[in-house]
């Protein structure tokens, strides 16, 4: 049996593992499809994550150094790559009552041939409806962060909306914004293929930020007013600077990205100072949710799964390219790390 592991920063490999029997509360899934996470996971893969030497302390609600002698947050050689898997249950523990052998399911899990997960009171272990798209299923995670960004931005009917960064989260945000009633939806991404897909699924316009004054172009497309809402998923300083320039007076930037450190030159003066800009940091996994107690991470997940399985969201175009598990180390290094412009969200078949 093999699993996909980061053996060193920016190096992926298939490594042998020994399978085990399930415990009473567990099921074993034979993976058929899967996908990695192109955002935070690749930051970890590049050894650029704050979680390596620090941890987010829930009591203090801040990053603090890991205690001396404790394991690092990411240990290369043990760090498994992958985010979602779809497959069939091949073994059930004695206490499992909601699932049976042969069920097709989707869950969080690394890219490996078999995955063992808790199957007692685990709503994250999702049964796949008959005929459901595996490509939609592996977008379960990015859909949550897209929905959170849209909700936290408070998009309303008639709004002018911009989505910066057209990876999986941005593409799903485009669909949600348009379906929420936005009158003008603008995508921003330098990759034309991504822009084509965004136009196919709701974007009225797309802008290439390279060599373009994105803020000015947003103002031109909205009759000089600017965007009511900008959803920023890229994490780059230039993108946020352009968003502040293209935002309408009193508008909201929903900041979804797990940002990289900003270089010298980022400016919170200029348009941000004059136009009463609001920046809301949006993260589906942070509890309590801004709309607690009505909304929680669980409700976001339940809603996203329903929208993915009933076809309200269409992610078939987003899973690109699709590679085999056998070639996944080289494919991961190429499409996820070295040349992310060649992919949106890489799919894996077993």
Locations of regions flagged by a protein language model:
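Mid-domain Rossmann-like dinucleotide-binding core that forms the NAD(H)/NADP(H) cofactor-binding site
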Residues: 133-212, 216
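A generic structural signal for residues embedded in beta-strands
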Residues: 29, 107-108, 163
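Residue-level marker of beta-strand positions
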Residues: 26, 103-104, 114, 160, ...
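A structural motif shared across PLP-dependent enzymes of the aminotransferase-like
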Residues: 80, 109-121
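Glycine-rich cofactor phosphate-binding loops and adjacent beta1-alpha1 units
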Residues: 155, 201-280
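Short N-terminal strand-loop motif that marks the start
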Residues: 1-73, 349-350
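C-terminal hydrophobic helical "lid"/dimerization subdomain
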Residues: 244, 249, 291-350
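A glycine-/small-residue-rich N-terminal strand-loop-strand element
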Residues: 69-109
């Amino acid at each position: 049996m093999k699993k996909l592991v980061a053996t060193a920063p920016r190096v992926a490999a298939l490594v042998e593992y020994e399978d085990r029997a399930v415990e009473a509360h567990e099921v074993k899934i034979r993976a058929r499809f899967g996908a990695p996470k192109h955002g935070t996971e690749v930051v970890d893969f590049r050894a650029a994550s704050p979680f390596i030497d620090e941890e987010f302390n829930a009591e203090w609600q801040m990053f603090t150094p890991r205690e001396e002698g404790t394991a690092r947050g990411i240990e290369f050689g043990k760090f498994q790559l992958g985010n979602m898997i779809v497959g069939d249950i091949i073994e059930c523990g004695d206490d499992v009552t909601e699932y049976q052998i042969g069920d097709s399911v989707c869950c969080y899990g690394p890219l490996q041939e078999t995955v063992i997960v808790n199957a007692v009171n685990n709503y994250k272990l999702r049964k796949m409806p008959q005929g459901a798209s595996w490509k939609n299923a592996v977008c379960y995670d990015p859909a949550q962060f897209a929905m959170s960004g849209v909700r936290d931005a408070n998009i309303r009917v008639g709004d002018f909306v911009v989505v910066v960064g057209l990876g999986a989260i941005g593409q799903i945000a485009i669909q949600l914004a348009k379906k929420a009633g936005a009158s003008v939806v603008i995508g921003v991404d330098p990759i034309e293929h991504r822009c084509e897909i965004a136009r196919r699924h709701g974007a009225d316009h797309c802008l290439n930020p390279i060599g373009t004054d994105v803020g000015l172009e947003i103002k031109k497309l909205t009759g000089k007013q600017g965007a009511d809402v900008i959803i920023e998923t890229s994490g780059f300083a230039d993108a946020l600077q352009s968003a502040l320039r293209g935002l309408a007076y009193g508008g909201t930037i929903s900041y979804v990205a797990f940002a990289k450190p900003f270089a010298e030159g980022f400016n919170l003066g200029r348009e941000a100072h004059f136009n009463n800009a609001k920046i809301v940091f949006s993260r589906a996994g942070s509890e309590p949710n801004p709309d607690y107690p009505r909304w929680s991470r669980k409700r976001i997940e339940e809603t996203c799964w329903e929208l993915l399985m009933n076809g309200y969201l269409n992610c078939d175009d987003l899973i690109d390219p699709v590679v085999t598990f056998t070639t996944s180390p080289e494919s991961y290094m190429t499409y996820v790390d070295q040349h992310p412009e060649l992919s949106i969200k890489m799919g894996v078949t077993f």
